[in-house]
Amino acid sequence: MMRIALFLLTNLAVMVVFGLVLSLTGIQSSSVQGLMIMALLFGFGGSFVSLLMSKWMALRSVGGEVIEQPRNERERWLVNTVATQACQAGIAMPQVAIYHAPDINAFATGARRDASLVAVSTGLLQNMSPDEAEAVIAHEISHIANGDMVTMTLIQGVVNTFVIFISRILAQLAAGFMGGNRDEGEESNGNPLIYFAVATVLELVFGILASIITMWFSRHREFHADAGSAKLVGREKMIAALQRLKTSYEPQEATSMMAFCINGKSKSLSELFMTHPPLDKRIEALRTGEYLK
């Protein structure tokens, strides 16, 4: 299943827009309780907007096409495989889509376990054996069965809430200190332009730091999805699929999609900001059975 970074762009846009609304409406003058309520509404708002739009955004991002009726043997195999594994995992049949990309990749998304989407790249269908492709699909089905999208939404909502709240409290203090005189006994928030500028910068900075939390969860859920695939189709098939990914093209999907894909980009400033664990760690975890217990 795909999931973090697609949220990040939408969350960022929603938070900036809501932040502007807060500034224009003077919400920074309200009580701490009022600000917390607004932060909760707006913080979770971005996450739930992302969740509800996730299938549409994902398909649009990669140019995916939902298979309404299989047109050839390859599409028929794909639909049948997804249907079989969905039944094994106890979820409703997801929509199935294909998108054109040379790299070996797949993702799953959707607002609910029973209203989900599984999409695979043409590169996966062309370059993986049936057993390897089956394991990748099982990995995505496991993401859906585990409810990773909803869990990610809740985590992102909490993170957004604290980012908004703390940023605006500090911005209010900074604006009051830098922006102006106030008469004794009269509440003042200083220069509103300073307030908005400081709040926006702090939201961006804290948002980047908070992404460490969401990225950790993204990596953690990959191990569990690998284990779920091993339970559905066998450990050796999943190991073989991951080994195949090591020799594949660097993923071409947009950065905002990486958390949803089975194959994440390997180049990163730090593992803290990676959506996926290194492939060698995932293979080792399967071999030791660490997440299969």
Curated annotation (Swiss-Prot):
Its cofactor is Zn(2+). It is found in: Cell inner membrane. GO terms for cellular component: plasma membrane. One of its GO terms (molecular function) is metalloendopeptidase activity. It is a multi-pass membrane protein. InterPro entries: HtpX_protease (IPR050083), Pept_M48_protease_HtpX (IPR022919), Peptidase_M48 (IPR001915). Pfam families: Peptidase_M48. Its main location: membrane. The keyword Transcription regulation does not apply. Zn(2+) binds at H139, H143, E222. Keywords: Cell inner membrane, Cell membrane, Hydrolase, Membrane, Metal-binding, Metalloprotease, Protease, Transmembrane, Transmembrane helix, Zinc. The chain crosses the membrane at residues 4-24, 34-54, 158-178, 193-213. Binds 1 zinc ion per subunit. One of its GO terms (biological process) is proteolysis. Its EC number is 3.4.24.-. Gene3D superfamilies: Metalloproteases ('zincins'), catalytic domain. Disulfide bonds: none annotated. The active site is at E140. The keyword Metal-binding applies. HAMAP family: Pept_M48_protease_HtpX. Belongs to the peptidase M48B family. This is Protease HtpX. The lineage of its organism: Bacteria, Pseudomonadati, Pseudomonadota, Gammaproteobacteria, Enterobacterales.
